[in-house]
Amino acid sequence: VRIEEAGDEAIIRTALEKAGLQNDKMKFFVAPGNGFWFRDCGPICFYYGDDDKIGMLDFLYDPRRPCDDLLPSVLHWKFGIPNYLVDLAWEGGNCLVDGIGGLVTSTATYKHNTDTIGSMYWDGVDPATIKYKKKESLSPSDVKYVLSNLLGQRQTTIVPTLNYDGGTGHIDLYLDATDENSFYMAQMPEANEGWSDYDIAVGNSAILFNKRNFFGRKYYDNGALPFPAKDDGSGWDTEEEYGEVARTYANHLICNDHIMQPCFSPVGADGMPTAAWDRKNIEKMQKLYPGYTFYCIDMRTFDGSGGSIHCITKQIPADNPVRIIHKNIYGDVNPVIPDAEKQYIPFSAIITNKSGIKEPKLYYSLDGKQWNDVSLT
């Protein structure tokens, strides 16, 4: 947790303890800042080597927020994580990767790289000493080349930017993924068919769901995320009106088996939004993300800011990850291997950990209630 004053740590810990929330695993560090859009200014992390060591890619950030642009360097100094500078402007809210060479971003990245402001340098103490080097502006082909070599080696997909998304051009306002096989995408109501962004969103959907995943199959559509309404539950009159607030359910944070979920009405004692239309949308989200516990937060104070929960948080990956990659099984599956008594559905997975895998098991359910397991060999 970045704080700008050392005394803030005690205040935050006390507030968490009063709320009955665990905080013993939290680490605080003091550093200067300009804002709180940590998704965008924070590092994009990766694993490397046989021991799954953690590294950080430090992309250029908004030069109007130089202290925030320093965040990856500060993390490097505080925690010793290797930090690699990249002379490409790219914000984390416009980054969706699958961990196996697939990357999605928007054409806003092209616009952000037309200037000549490069990497910064300073004395490491006084933010007033911050200065920027100059660089050449990058063409769209230059941008795609860099991204394709760093994170999108298998496939780099760059989709058109929406016109009325709050001004960021970020894909995390309407696109999400929980695995390497599929996407979730927000869907505008049919009443908005005349909007320019409606057509762009439909086109982006066609682009994404015609791409091939790691297993050579088209990405699966996990379902349409609902579209937020006004406070009274009515729709937006124009896309310009919507763009002034740019509410979104997609901009949530997935943390283990919990989802920190934006909503747009007061949260009741049951943890759900109190407005009927808002509650109905969250209930739809719960069905789209089975197995997750939702923690709803009324984010109306962020209306017009261009972001929500996902935008103000940034994770550093686990230092001992278990990586599981497998082809998902969707819909009705016909048994393919006949047997006198049983019929089987073949399943395989790539499972890795630096300490090795002792006994992998597949857990499955036929009715969504009773779970069974079988050893993978």
Go through each PLM region and give its residues.
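The feature marks the mature, well-folded catalytic cores of soluble enzymes
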Residues: 1-325
